Amino acid sequence: MFRWRKGKCRGRKLRDIYISGLPAVRAMIPEPGTGKKPVAINLAEAEALRLVDYEEMSFDDAAAKMGVSKATVWRLVNAARKKMAKAVFEGRAILITKGGELERL
């Protein structure tokens, strides 16, 4: 279930995802503007991608730091990687958007 649907349907209450800090950059735009619709990555996906790929944490450590399960981190990282690849190979802009996550500083 997408996090933006929080509270709009029945089922288990979604847990909050802890973000260690806001990214310094909110968007990456290709040099020759293509005019295509940008790809939106939410803060949870960006945080999971940063922890696993940039800081080279294991999925277990990243899950503990974010306060979610290892499977959730795996889904977030895969979604972020797919969106990043789409943006790079189609020449789209990448936007980092908020999605209702808590911020732990």
UniProtKB/Swiss-Prot annotation:
Pfam families: DUF134. Belongs to the UPF0251 family. SUPFAM superfamilies: Sigma3 and sigma4 domains of RNA polymerase sigma factors. The lineage of its organism: Archaea, Methanobacteriati, Methanobacteriota, Archaeoglobi, Archaeoglobales. It comes from the Archaea. This is UPF0251 protein AF_0666. It comes from Archaeoglobus fulgidus (strain ATCC 49558 / DSM 4304 / JCM 9628 / NBRC 100126 / VC-16). InterPro entries: RNA_pol_sigma_r3/r4-like, UPF0251, WH-like_DNA-bd_sf.
